[in-house]
């Protein structure tokens, strides 16, 4: 095993305990004259019955001229607290940062006074931190509500002051067209077809939206209600056109058109009844029909009902019967003519 550290000086008969004033004067005189380069050799060279460690501690802690006496100032205490937080219990390094103060007295003041002071500060910070942890949840809400109310109030005032200026670009003008006075007969007369217009491109078409001075205007077309009488007039004109009438002729009156259409429907019904009577062998106009509608036969049959029967494809589908039921000839066979 190694020798390790040298044994203590007490084993060779050196002095122990407190220093006497004569020993202090010898140590001070030697260090001022030769310095303290080697603390192990210093006691023998100075003529002291002390070990090197005892001489060093006596010089550093009590005898050096720059040593400060008295209590620590507030600045020194704050410096010790800060350095202890950085370096820990390395008292020699802390003492090197505080001139005039020894590591021993710094350790003593820390253990007796500053340690309790730091503990109280940490408790206060912990209490303040717990209180602040509960308040931020409500503080942002209150600030947010206050900012919201302020923003709303300012927005309301701004909107009230600028209601005529800031919102004008968003508003759209709606133009309504007044319906022009026109005659019903002008609507029924077929006008000249409009000239062919080129197909509008998608980029140029605005679909009833025009931009005038940067403001969009929507044109609302009026809704024209067409009365039922007008539709009846249009239906009557189309029926007359199908039967050879002039489609371009203007309507002279509502009553005349309605009566003409009713007469045409009645004539068509009579014609189908005649076909049914002809199928059943009851063909022939009654005297009331010929007297009531003398022009019906001339319009549909020409000279006679037989001519109409030959010209009508529907009538020729049915088998034609005799014009009048002729009496059948009955042959009476006498009993004498019977063959034996």
Curated annotation (Swiss-Prot):
DNA-binding region: 39-63, 91-114
Region listing for Disordered, in residue ranges: 116-173, 190-209
Keyword Nucleus: yes
All copies of domain HTH myb-type, residue ranges: 11-63, 64-118
Keywords: Activator, DNA-binding, Nucleus, Repeat, Transcription, Transcription regulation
CDD domains per record: SANT (cd00167)
Main location: nucleus
UniProt cross-references to Pfam families, sorted A to Z: Myb_DNA-binding
Extent of Basic residues compositional bias: 116-126
GO molecular function: DNA binding
Residues in the signal sequence: none
Family annotation (InterPro entries): Homeodomain-like_sf (IPR009057), Myb_dom (IPR017930), Myb_TF_plants (IPR015495), SANT/Myb (IPR001005)
Cell membrane keyword on record: no
Domain of life: Eukaryota
Compositional bias (Low complexity): 133-166
Subcellular location: Nucleus
Record-level GO cellular component terms: nucleus
Biological function: Transcription factor that positively regulates genes involved in anthocyanin biosynthesis such as A1.
Protein name: Myb-related protein Zm1
Species, as recorded: Zea mays
Lineage of the organism: Eukaryota, Viridiplantae, Streptophyta, Embryophyta, Tracheophyta
């Amino acid at each position: 095993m190694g020798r390790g550290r040298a044994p203590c000086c007490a084993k060779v008969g050196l002095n122990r305990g407190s220093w006497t004033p004569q020993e202090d004067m010898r140590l001070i005189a030697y260090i001022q004259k030769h310095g303290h380069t080697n603390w192990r050799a210093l006691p023998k060279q100075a003529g002291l019955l002390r070990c090197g460690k005892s001489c060093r501690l006596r010089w550093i802690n009590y005898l050096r001229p720059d040593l400060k006496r008295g209590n620590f100032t507030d600045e020194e205490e704050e410096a010790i607290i800060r350095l202890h937080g950085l370096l820990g219990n390395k008292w020699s390094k802390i003492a090197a940062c505080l001139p005039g103060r020894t590591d021993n007295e710094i350790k003593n003041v820390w253990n007796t006074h500053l340690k309790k002071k730091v503990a109280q500060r940490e408790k206060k910070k912990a209490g303040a931190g717990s209180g602040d942890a509960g308040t931020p949840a409500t503080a942002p809400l209150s600030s947010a509500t206050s900012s919201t109310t302020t923003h709303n109030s300012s927005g309301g005032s701004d909107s009230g002051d600028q209601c005529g200026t800031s919102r004008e670009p968003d508003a759209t003008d709606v133009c309504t067209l007044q319906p022009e006075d026109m005659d019903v007969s002008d609507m029924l007369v077929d006008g000249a077809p409009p000239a062919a217009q080129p197909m509008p491109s998608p980029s140029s078409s605005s679909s009833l939206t025009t931009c005038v001075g940067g403001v969009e205007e929507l044109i609302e077309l009026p809704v024209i209600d067409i009365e039922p009488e007008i539709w009846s007039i249009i239906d009557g004109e189309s029926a007359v056109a199908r039967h050879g009438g002039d489609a371009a002729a203007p309507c002279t009156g509502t009553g005349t058109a309605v009566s003409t259409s009713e007469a045409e429907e009645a004539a068509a019904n009579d014609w189908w009844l005649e076909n049914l009577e002809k199928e059943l062998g009851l063909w022939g106009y009654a005297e009331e029909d010929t007297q009531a509608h003398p022009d019906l036969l001339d319009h549909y049959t020409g000279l006679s009902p037989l001519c109409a029967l030959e010209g009508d494809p529907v009538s020729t589908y049915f088998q034609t019967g005799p014009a009048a039921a002729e009496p059948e000839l009955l042959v009476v066979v006498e009993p004498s003519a019977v063959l034996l």
